[in-house]
């Protein structure tokens, strides 16, 4: 992938959510919402602080993350893949 996010931006590929319940029922509509989990494909150099220094990001390439789908979430198609461009503050957790 040939993309480099700037500053505190992160490129995430959404992971597919299971479309069946634990009991085997196929979920549709709002019950089968888009996943808010994904794999980090690229990260920016960090957040620029008021004093001009750069604070590195906590997430790294390859991390699986849980993110908030917010107004600022940008979806792009890059190399045939649909990816999200998020600010690091939209990432809620790293799955370990």
Curated annotation (Swiss-Prot):
Location (main, coarse)? cytoplasm
Q: What InterPro entries does this protein map onto?
A: Chaperonin_GroES (IPR020818), Chaperonin_GroES_sf (IPR037124), Chaprnonin_Cpn10_CS (IPR018369), GroES-like_sf (IPR011032)
Q: Do you know which Gene3D superfamilies this protein is assigned to?
A: GroES chaperonin
Please name the GO terms that the record assigns under molecular function: ATP binding; metal ion binding; protein folding chaperone; protein-folding chaperone binding; unfolded protein binding
CDD domains the UniProt entry points to: cpn10 (cd00320)
An example of a Gene Ontology BP annotation on this entry?
Answer: chaperone cofactor-dependent protein refolding
Location comes to:
Cytoplasm
Which stretches are annotated as coiled coil?
none
Q: Which UniProt keywords apply?
A: Chaperone, Cytoplasm
Please state the span of the N-terminal signal peptide per the UniProt entry.
none
Q: Which superkingdom heads the taxonomic lineage of this protein's source? A: Bacteria
Example of a GO cellular component annotation carried by this entry: cytoplasm
Instruction: Relate the assembly described in the record.
Output: Heptamer of 7 subunits arranged in a ring. Interacts with the chaperonin GroEL.
Family listed: Belongs to the GroES chaperonin family.
Role according to the record: Together with the chaperonin GroEL, plays an essential role in assisting protein folding. The GroEL-GroES system forms a nano-cage that allows encapsulation of the non-native substrate proteins and provides a physical environment optimized to promote and accelerate protein folding. GroES binds to the apical surface of the GroEL ring, thereby capping the opening of the GroEL channel.
Its protein name is: Co-chaperonin GroES 1
């Amino acid at each position: 992938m040939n993309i480099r996010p700037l500053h505190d931006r992160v490129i995430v590929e959404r992971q597919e959510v299971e479309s069946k319940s634990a009991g085997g029922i196929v979920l549709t509509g709002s019950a089968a919402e888009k996943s808010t989990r994904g794999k980090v494909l690229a990260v920016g150099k960090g957040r620029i602080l008021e004093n001009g220094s750069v604070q590195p990001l906590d997430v790294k390439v390859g991390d699986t993350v849980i993110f908030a789908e917010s107004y600022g979430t940008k979806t792009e198609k890059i190399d045939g893949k649909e990816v999200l461009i998020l600010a690091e503050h939209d990432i809620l957790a790293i799955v370990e």
